[in-house]
């Protein structure tokens, strides 16, 4: 999967189209990513109390994963771009490259 944790992405389709956010978690086996502030859902949790008597539960708002095809990585210029790879001559490792401007990501 070409989108990694910590990348800044732009949502290109869906109800949050146009929103930018940072990838909190990537799920490569499911081809999904969790983006900060995008695809917020309300989760209903059971009310329970701990040993001090404080109650927790109710309605919690949190992010839900979205499919990786609905996001594009934002490059160093702030534009959405596709991702390519090249082999670094010094280290011999694969490096992600912006298809828009050719710079490393």
Curated annotation (Swiss-Prot):
Sequence similarity: Belongs to the universal ribosomal protein uL24 family.
Protein name in the entry: Large ribosomal subunit protein uL24
PANTHER family attached to this UniProt entry: MITOCHONDRIAL RIBOSOMAL PROTEIN L24
Gene expressing this chain: rplX
GO biological process, one term: translation
CDD domains linked: KOW_RPL26
Keyword RNA-binding carried by entry: yes
A single GO cellular-component term on record: ribosome
Subunit structure: Part of the 50S ribosomal subunit.
Keywords: Ribonucleoprotein, Ribosomal protein, RNA-binding, rRNA-binding
Role of this protein: One of two assembly initiator proteins, it binds directly to the 5'-end of the 23S rRNA, where it nucleates assembly of the 50S subunit.
Molecular function GO terms recorded: rRNA binding; structural constituent of ribosome
Pfam families tied to this protein: KOW (PF00467), ribosomal_L24 (PF17136)
Lineage: Bacteria, Bacillati, Actinomycetota, Actinomycetes, Mycobacteriales
SMART domains hit by this protein: KOW
InterPro entries xrefs: KOW (IPR005824), Rib_uL2_dom2 (IPR014722), Ribosomal_uL24 (IPR003256), Ribosomal_uL24_CS (IPR005825), Ribosomal_uL24_KOW (IPR041988), Translation_prot_SH3-like_sf (IPR008991)
UniProt cross-references to HAMAP family, sorted A to Z: Ribosomal_uL24_B (MF_01326_B)
Organism, as annotated: Mycobacterium sp. (strain KMS)
């Amino acid at each position: 999967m070409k989108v990694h944790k910590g990348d800044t992405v732009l949502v290109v389709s869906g109800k949050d189209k146009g929103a930018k956010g940072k990838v909190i978690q990537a799920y490569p086996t499911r081809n999904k990513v969790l983006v900060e502030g995008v695809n917020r859902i309300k989760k209903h949790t059971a009310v329970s109390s701990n040993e001090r008597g404080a109650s927790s539960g109710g309605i919690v708002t949190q992010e839900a994963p979205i499919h990786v095809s609905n996001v594009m990585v934002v490059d160093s210029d702030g534009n959405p771009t596709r991702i390519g790879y090249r082999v670094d001559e010094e280290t011999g490792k694969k490096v992600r490259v912006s298809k828009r401007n050719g710079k490393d990501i």
